Amino acid sequence: MISPHPTMSLPSFKRFDVRKLIAQGIEPLPEIRKRVDALKPDEGLAIVSPFLPSPLIEKLRGEDFETRVEPQPDGSWVTYFWRAAPAG
């Protein structure tokens, strides 16, 4: 488990690297969906991808997930997703 930022008081993050799946021509969305659906309230998902997953970001934001994106020196991207805290 990893954290997107040392000062962020966020859940622990499960890492899922989709680069090999994509390189093999496999659509990673079904596996991402399984992992997102299995998240506990105190967990988040960190996805490592070869490109910025803009459609996924928009989709999960529409499901009340917060997002943080970090470009990596090797050209890959780490995108963190976690459930937004309930209002109030």
State the predicted function of each range:
Residues 2-39:
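An N-terminal amphipathic alpha-helical segment
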Residues 64-88:
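C-terminal edge-of-domain segments
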Residues 11-13, 42-46, 76-78:
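Intrinsic-disorder/low-complexity, polar/charged segments enriched in Ser/Thr/Lys/Arg/Asp/Glu/Gln
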Residues 22, 58, 72:
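Hydrophobic small-molecule pocket/channel-lining residues, especially in calycin-type beta-barrels
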Residues 39, 44, 86-87:
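An acidic-aromatic pocket/loop used at catalytic or ligand-binding sites
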Residues 33-36, 55, 69:
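General detector of folded, globular domains
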Residues 43-66:
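Short, structured protein-protein interaction patches enriched in aromatics and acidic/basic residues
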